[in-house]
Amino acid sequence: MQERSVDPRALGAAAVKAAKHRGVDVSSGSEVTEILISDGSIGGVRTDKTSYAAPVVVNCAGAWAGNLGPQQFPTRPVKGQMLSVAGGPRNTPRHVIRSPEVYLVPRSDGRVLIGATVEEAGFDKRTDPATIEQMHRAALHLIPALGRARILEAWAGLRPGTPDNLPILGPMPTPGYFVATGHFRDGILLTPVTAHVMAQVVTGAKPEYDISAFSPVRFQA
């Protein structure tokens, strides 16, 4: 079976556009600094710019999720460095290629993504030139013609890790407070099913899938 890939940036932009089309108010460029409590239940969120009142809050803050809200839970950032190069007709793979050192992901716009590291480096999102060069060399070992490709970009992201390497999904003890995080390297791939099951949980419906093993309260003594 041929392996496919998803462009997280394109998917994110499309999701925002679709949400706005359905009448959802989207606020970007603001940092959530506090989850508000009112009479023992969720009251909304405070950002670095304003506050929003709401009876339900879903914490999807990734590696930062565990430090927000009335009850904390263990999440940690796991750094991943990547780079992209400008592919061409003769050096762009038609499918995902993997080796023990690196993987290559072709994009529809001609780019080739090369990744990715797994680093316990805290919230440091800086790229390391030596690491980027090492991944580039590993990619050239798989496709030597990429040596003629121009490096377009290098970046680092922070994946949300958990102590047992499982996602954190479901309600917290505070009424109206829900969590969806901890997907590590598979967050973008699990977005559809996560959104589907969390919508059921938030609206009080029985989840289509059993997510009890992912409950955020499993970490509480």
Task: Walk through the language-model features, giving the residues of each.
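Helical element adjacent to the flavin cofactor pocket in flavoenzyme catalytic cores
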Residues: 1-48, 52-56
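Generic structural signal for well-ordered, non-membrane alpha-helical segments
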Residues: 4, 8, 12, 128, ...
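Active-site catalytic microenvironments for nucleophilic, acid-base chemistry
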Residues: 18, 60, 64-67, 197, ...
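Hydrophobic/aromatic beta-strand patches that form the interior of the parallel beta-sheet core
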Residues: 27, 58, 178-180
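Active-site substrate-recognition segment that forms the wall
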Residues: 52-175
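C-terminal catalytic lobe of FAD-dependent flavoproteins
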Residues: 143-221
